[in-house]
Amino acid sequence: MKNIVTLSDYNYLYKGLALYKSLASTSSEKFNLYYLCLDKDSFKKLNDLNLPNLIPVNTDIKDLARDPNAFYSTNDPGGQKFRHYCFSLSSRGVKYLFKKYKLKDIFYIDSDIFFYEDIDLLKKESGDKAVAIFPHLHVPKPTHVGAYNVGVIYFKNNPEGNEVLNFWEDCVINPKNKYRNSGYDTCGDQKYVELFEDLFPKSIHIYGSKNIVHGAPYNYEYFVFLNFLKKVVKFTRPPGYQNIEYIDKEYIMPFFHFMGFFPDFENNSYAPSNEPNNQRFMLDPLIRLAYNDYFLFCKNVSERYGLSSNNSKIKEAKYA
């Protein structure tokens, strides 16, 4: 049994349900997707849909609710914004699910990720390590966005995994944490992940050191697809090569991270990403094909499940 957690409000349900469908079509064994619902509409909709292996979780409860007076992830005024509260749920949500459901392990996955290969590939690569993280390849250290990405993170519910998890949670909820205002509070919960490897080196696996890499807008220009259908790639020496054990070999890219993807379903168009580091990736016809397919998949999901969203439109769609 694979345990997975994601989150969104109602407006992003089409992305979360696309993730769910991609997992259902690629997973070799049963999985449960725990869905942290950021508003009442998303919680009601998922309960009404009653989809197999998808468990809606109400975040308006003691262990997960937002404290409007709290500072999440940073002591700057921005720490009181809703998005910083959302950042806190990566760690708090995992901790809550471990406690409530006695899960042996879990993957936290952003809702705008889509799997093309079995998630079991990630579990096999991490082996016995208690925590597994993906490095950024587009920027060298130091960087304000952090050397690692929180789009996919794996935790075991054991002493080593919980030591890291509790540390991460404290970073994002405790304004007196010593790493606040020390250069690690610059990108929500993400920059703190750099500390995992430094403080808990024996517990951490870094993806990219073996067979798997992270597909994302900021990484695509460093990859060459050898087999697009199987998502087999090689990559050139990226700026963040020191974040991995750089080896000239073939890798599997089991998922794409469609971050900043904004569709306009009514006009059959979309903006692929708001990623500032690289807007050239859509020049690659294979990447553009993947984005076209993702748009159509999300549109089908939205129509099939009767979703409507005020945020599913963009002012200027770039691709049609």
Label each region the model flagged.
Residues F87-H138, Y154:
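GT-A fold catalytic core of metal-dependent nucleotide-sugar glycosyltransferases
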Residues G240-A320:
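Long, low-complexity C-terminal extensions of enzymes
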Residues L33-L51:
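Glycosyltransferase specificity loop/lid
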Residues E160-D264, N268:
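Catalytic core and acceptor-binding pocket of nucleotide-sugar-dependent glycosyltransferases
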Residues I119, K123-K178:
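Conserved catalytic core of nucleotide-sugar-dependent glycosyltransferases
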Residues L51-K99:
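Active-site-proximal specificity loops/subdomain of glycosyltransferases
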Residues M1-L17:
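N-proximal low-complexity "stem/linker" segments adjacent to membrane-targeting elements
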Residues S22-K30:
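Short, acidic, metal-binding catalytic loop of nucleotide-sugar glycosyltransferases
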